Each structure stands twice: as structure tokens, then as C-alpha cells.
Amino acid sequence: MDTILQFDHSLIFYVHEHFVYSFLTPIMAFISKITSNGALWIIIALLLMLQKKYRVLGVAIIIALGFVFIIGDQGLKPNVARLRPFVDFPNVTVPLESALPKATSYSFPSGHSFGSFASAMTIYLGLGQIAPQKRYLGILALLGSIVVAFSRVYLFAHYPTDVLTGLELGIIVGFIAWKLARIGWNWWTNRHNDVEYEPYTFKRK
């Protein structure tokens, strides 16, 4: 445990001392804000659900975010009850105080990281089967999730292991969510076998 804490403290202070710049802070704050509570991913999911071809993918993202809420917000956070770095180190000057969450909220795991990687992995897997030529968008989503995770450490809102755990859990949840969405699609299409759909879509052939 001491080794993990030492790693966390060393890395977050390294980022704080070597990567914080005045021009970068508002960018990190904006990225963090638009992904708070899964907002960006919910919007993407709703937009996908408006299209028959990508409706199943949109549902899968909502499933993933549901797991994130149950496992992260309702399960791990209150039970682990890890304090945030800016609470542990109140004398540190954070990049932007207004970008910080409530001091009473817990740090482990990072909800931003968990939700972003769960959604991005779902998008990557879904596009790989629905529209393989667009799988690169899933890769971009995963790369964007790395930036989201970094923004949380940058802003002194999370320790590195908070976001790394969010990454790992998010990838697992993404796999599960897409699997469940496929099962749901198979169940639906088997009930309506008089209509032939393109794989994992509601777009008729």
C-alpha cells in the first residue's frame, strides 16, 4: 500500500510541477467539464439512438454508463472513501480551483476516466461490427479518454491510480455493455424474424 501511495504522490506532483501551463489549464478544465457525469457520452449515445443503423450502439453506451454509476458512484467510491489529492494536500496551489469537485466527494475510482473508457470501448467494439470502416472513430474516442484521464490528474482532482483503475474498469464494462446490447438485439430480431436487419442495427436489408 505504501508503494502505491508513493507512486501516486510522486507522479501527481511530477505532473503538477512539469506539465501545468496557463494556456493548458482552461483546456483541461473544459475537457473535464464536458465529460462530467458522462454528459458528452450521453449526448453521443442519444444522437446514435436517433439513427436506425447505430441505435444498438447508443443503447450499449447507456448500458455502460449505467454500470459506471452502479459500480463506481454507488459501489466503490463510498466504500473505498479515498480523499481527493487537493484535500490531502490543502496547501498545494491547484491549477484552477473552480474546476474541482466538492471536497466531500471521493476520489477512487475516477468517474470521468471510468465513464469515458467504458463509452469509448463500447464505441470501438460496436463500430467494429456495425461499420468496420469507421472503427477509427472508436480509436479516437479511446485516445480522447486518455486526455480526459490526464485532465483529472492535471487538475489535482484525482490520483494516477484513480484514473488507471477507471481505465481498466471502463474497458471491462465496455466489453460487457456491448455483449449485452448484442444479446438484446438477437432477442429482438428473433422475435421479429419476418424482418431482416443488417447485423446489430435496426436498418432493414
Language model features: what each stretch is:
Residues M1-L40, D73-S105, K203-K205:
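N-terminal transmembrane-helix/juxtamembrane module of multi-pass inner/ER membrane proteins
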Residues H18, S22, L50, Y54, ...:
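Membrane-interface elements of multi-pass transporters and channels
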Residues L96-K205:
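Membrane-embedded catalytic cores of phosphoryl/pyrophosphoryl-handling enzymes
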Residues I4-F7, V20-I27, I34-T35, Q51, ...:
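Structural motif marking the loop-to-transmembrane transition
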Residues I62-I71, G75, E168, I172-I176:
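Hydrophobic, lipid-facing residues on alpha-helical transmembrane segments of integral membrane proteins
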Residues I44-G72, G138:
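Interfacial segments of alpha-helical transmembrane regions
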Residues Y14, A45-M49, A149, V153:
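Solvent-exposed, amphipathic alpha-helical segments
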